[in-house]
Regions:
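Extreme N-terminal starter segment of soluble prokaryotic enzymes
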Residues: 1-4
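Core catalytic region of metal-dependent phosphoesterases/phosphodiesterases
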Residues: 6-88, 192-196
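Divalent metal-coordination and catalytic microenvironments
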Residues: 8, 27, 32, 59, ...
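Active-site environment of divalent metal-dependent phosphoester hydrolases
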Residues: 10-15, 34-38, 60-67, 102-106, ...
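Conserved catalytic scaffold of divalent metal-dependent phosphoesterases
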Residues: 11, 62-156
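Binuclear metal-dependent phosphoesterase catalytic core
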Residues: 15, 69, 83-91, 108, ...
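Short acidic/histidine-rich motifs immediately flanking catalytic phosphotransfer sites
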Residues: 23-26, 127-129, 165
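Short, conserved loop/helix-junction motifs that constitute active-site signature segments
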Residues: 46-51, 125-126, 161-164, 184
Length: 201
């Protein structure tokens, strides 16, 4: 089974068309299809033929209600704060989705405090094997370094991953680090960006 995870399209329809042409069993949009909610319907028309193969998270540019309505209109799966099973070659896996970002200086519509992030992750403690898709990166990795020595990730997410060691973490949000990977213990971490990351399970 092939899973294509991508993020931060921000209304770039050409990039989204490239994603839609790729072959996958599941397509996970890890937030920020739009710019402040504008252009979601244009994205929906491109992805509509894929139907329930498309799982969607809100980024910090979208609200949960916008993404829920968007998924209802186009027949997609609202993946925000959901746990969904997928069968891999080696057995069952669990996929968890968490949208929004940690707090930013920009007061965007979809932001969580560290306390809210902790509350959202608590229900995932101990689930194995877990594949975690979030919009925002963990702190102090190659994925959240937006300028040399400057990091914008979530300390709460970092601590949770260190403690729980999911098999994979996929994120976006920091455009400057799209395509980079890192490890936290045994957890493989990827900033998927708008070009996406294809995982075979």
């Amino acid at each position: 089974m092939n899973i294509l995870i991508f993020s931060d399209i921000h209304g770039d329809l050409r990039a989204l068309e490239k994603i839609a042409r790729r072959q996958a069993d599941v397509y996970i949009a890890a937030g920020d299809l739009s710019n402040f909610g504008k252009g979601l319907d244009r994205c929906g028309e491109i992805l509509r033929p894929l139907g329930k193969k498309v799982w969607v998270l809100p980024g910090n540019h979208e609200t949960q209600s916008e993404i829920h309505s968007f998924c209802q209109r186009y027949g997609f799966i609202d993946f925000h704060r959901q746990l969904r099973p997928l069968e891999s070659a080696s057995g069952p896996t669990q996929w968890a989705g968490l949208g929004y970002s940690n707090l930013t200086p920009f007061n965007t519509p979809g932001e969580y405090s560290e306390e809210e992030i902790s509350e959202a992750l608590t229900g995932l403690d101990g689930i194995k094997p877990l594949y975690l898709v979030v919009h925002f990166p963990p702190l102090n990795t190659t994925l959240d370094e937006f300028a040399p020595g400057k990091h914008a990730g979530s300390p709460t997410l970092r601590e949770w991953v260190t403690r729980n060691q999911p098999a994979y973490l996929f994120c976006g949000h920091i455009h400057e680090t799209a395509g980079r990977s890192d490890r936290i213990g045994q957890t493989q971490c990827f900033n998927v960006g708008k070009d996406g990351y294809l995982l075979e399970i």
